[in-house]
Amino acid sequence: MKLRWFAFLVVLLAGCATKRDYENPPWNAKVPVQRAMQWMPISQKAGAAWNVDPQLITAIIAIESGGNPNAVSKSNAVGLMQLKASTSGRDVYRRMGWSGEPTTSELKNPERNISMGAAYLNILETGPLAGIKDPQVLQYALVVSYANGAGALLRTFSSDRKKAITKINDLSADEFFDHVAKNHPAPQAPRYIWKLQRALDEM
């Protein structure tokens, strides 16, 4: 009997741990947000130009680089908003009608990096994520798509974009988060939403 109870307890605890895996390791948003806030004047300017909430931009800066304009990741994402020249950078250049992609030095320039990051968020919102009605669900969808691609997110709902958007519009923000936690192939996707909320709460 004791052995059976112990086995049940182990399974229960394992389930609880798995449910909140996105909170590990712990992340304190206070210092990253303080450092990201120093760029708020640029974020406000870029947000106005691209119709993006400056607080969302600031939260992404806090999460991605901790406010360090010279940050470079192992995957070669660069600057405050950790943009990759060959993907998001190229998409922004295309939107602007330019050829090629941004240089590393350009991406390390705070004003250029934030402007391109805001532009990329606008590309996501008006492109693959167009049609999402709930503002908070859209915000969650934006950050997951920013980090892991819009296609990966939409495919967790349907291979057809319109059907995926329809299904997303049936969900509350909490339900959307639960869906991402259970179905997104990237384990960091729900963690990004969790970090977003912590960063916004610090502002």
UniProtKB/Swiss-Prot annotation:
Entry-linked Pfam families:
SLT
What do the Gene Ontology cellular component annotations say? cell outer membrane
What Enzyme Commission number(s) apply to this enzyme? 4.2.2.n2
User: What enzyme category does the UniProt record give?
Assistant: lyase
Listed A to Z, the keywords are: Cell outer membrane, Cell wall biogenesis/degradation, Lipoprotein, Lyase, Membrane, Palmitate, Signal
The record's listing under InterPro entries reads: EmtA, Lysozyme-like_dom_sf, Transglyc_AS, Transglycosylase_SLT_dom_1
Q: Lipid (S-diacylglycerol cysteine) attached at which positions?
A: 16
Q: Where in the cell is it found?
A: Cell outer membrane
Instruction: State the PROSITE patterns in the record.
Output: PROKAR_LIPOPROTEIN, TRANSGLYCOSYLASE
Record CDD domains: LT_MltC_MltE
Presence of keyword Lipoprotein: yes
Range of residues in the leader sequence: 1-15
Which family, according to the similarity comment? Belongs to the transglycosylase Slt family.
The name this protein carries in UniProt is: Endo-type membrane-bound lytic murein transglycosylase A
Which organism's genome codes for this protein? Escherichia fergusonii (strain ATCC 35469 / DSM 13698 / CCUG 18766 / IAM 14443 / JCM 21226 / LMG 7866 / NBRC 102419 / NCTC 12128 / CDC 0568-73)
Native organism taxonomy: Bacteria, Pseudomonadati, Pseudomonadota, Gammaproteobacteria, Enterobacterales
Q: Which gene encodes it?
A: emtA
